[in-house]
A protein has these predicted regions:
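Conserved beta-sheet core of the metallophosphoesterase superfamily
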Residues: 227-310, 318
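Core catalytic region of metal-dependent phosphoesterases/phosphodiesterases
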Residues: 73-182
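N-terminal active-site segment of His-dependent metallophosphoesterases
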Residues: 25-108, 128
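Acidic/histidine-rich helix-loop elements
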Residues: 56-75, 96-98, 127-138, 257-268, ...
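Binuclear metal-dependent hydrolase catalytic cores centered on His/Asp/Glu-rich metal-binding motifs
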Residues: 132-133, 138-171, 175-177, 183-224, ...
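Hydrophobic alpha-helical topogenic segments used for membrane insertion/localization
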Residues: 10-33
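Beta-strand-turn-beta hairpins that frame and shape the catalytic cleft
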Residues: 46-60, 171-172, 178-190, 217-219, ...
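Active-site neighborhood of phospho(di)ester-bond hydrolases with catalytic His/Asp-centered motifs
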Residues: 60-63, 88-94, 117-123, 174-176, ...
Length: 320
């Protein structure tokens, strides 16, 4: 018999609420794992940084592909990106999520290698992913696989083979290097670093001397995997016209209407994805942080943060 104070009906209501919450949670997990992580998109941005009179120039920014064998949807989408016919492809690392992913990755990126490209590595181009506590990201950036605090021996990836494959395709390695390319009559001076998340960055400065068109107008583009503030400060103070980075996955799991909860580095979470302006010592530089294309195969889930490539259309600076 139910008590007169209605406690039985109260417990029944509470049970229904708990059941609804559990069902909602399960639905969100299924959506994030089965739908959103394969719901690829191209984010388009425009930025006026080219010399006066320059024609529009398109840059396709790829990052955090995290490919594993069998990811056919991702590989098919990567091949289709060639239809964008970019003037330049910039790959900011973390291409792999499996020791056997190099050949499938190079096949998927093959059509894009018909276009000029540059690249830098991320930690997941050196080491295979590990199973980590996802709540650990709220305490700060994940530890390096090389860290002394790690008790597990990291599984090394064939980084040399990956970079050789990119090089065979004509892409330029910017790992702690500087290089000039003349594209559509504009001299692009690139300066790249090895992954700051591994504390491997060494600054090469900007290219010296001349490319094939030494008198061409210069545009300085800095490239890094992880957008740590020290790296953004350095390139901004070194007069970069644009900085491109990845690593954050855009937060990977976001709250609708709020955004990223973590950035996996010291970048403020509101900067975890998108085109923003970085300030340092009175200077400013636009920074594009890609939300990434993949996830670690140990955490195959995205929520309110679709996987993306970024198509940047660079245009001429306005006439003063």
């Amino acid at each position: 018999m139910a008590r007169a104070d209605g406690s039985s009906s109260g417990w029944a209501t509470l049970g229904k609420v708990a059941g609804l919450a559990a069902a909602t949670g399960a639905g969100c997990v299924a959506y994030g794992a089965l739908i959103e992580r394969n719901w690829f998109t191209v984010r388009e941005e425009s930025l006026a940084i080219l010399p006066h009179g320059s024609a529009p120039f398109t840059v396709l920014h790829l990052s955090d592909i995290h490919l594993a064998p069998g990811q056919e949807k991702k590989m098919g989408w990567l091949r289709e990106l060639a239809r964008l016919e970019p003037d330049l492809v910039v790959n900011t690392g973390d291409n792999l999520s499996h020791t056997e992913a190099i050949r499938p990755l190079l096949d998927a990126l093959g059509p894009l290698m018909d276009f000029p490209g540059v690249f830098v590595p991320g930690s997941n181009d050196y080491f295979a992913p590990r199973l980590n506590n996802p709540f650990g990201y709220f305490r700060g950036p994940s530890s390096s696989p090389e860290s002394r605090t790690q008790r597990r021996v990291p599984i090394k990836l064939d980084t040399a083979a990956l970079h050789a494959g990119f090089g065979m395709g004509g892409w330029v390695n910017l790992t702690n290097r500087a290089q000039s390319l003349v594209l559509k009559g504009i001299r692009f001076d690139f300066s790249g670093v090895d992954d700051p998340h591994l504390n491997r960055e060494k600054y090469a400065g900007w290219p010296r001397g001349s490319a094939s068109q030494g008198s061409a107008p210069h545009v300085k583009v800095a490239v890094a995997h992880a957008p740590y503030q020290r790296v953004l400060d350095h390139f901004t103070n070194d007069r970069a016209d644009l900085i491109l980075a990845g690593h954050t996955h855009g937060g990977q799991v976001c709250l609708p209407g709020y955004g990223a909860l973590v950035s996996n580095c010291d970048l403020p979470t509101w900067r975890a994805k998108g085109l923003t302006v970085w300030q340092s010592d009175g200077r400013t530089t636009p920074v594009n942080v890609s939300g990434g294309i993949g996830t670690s195969r140990m955490a195959p889930f995205r929520f309110a943060c679709r996987p993306e490539a970024v198509l940047l259309t660079l245009t001429a600076k306005p006439t003063v």
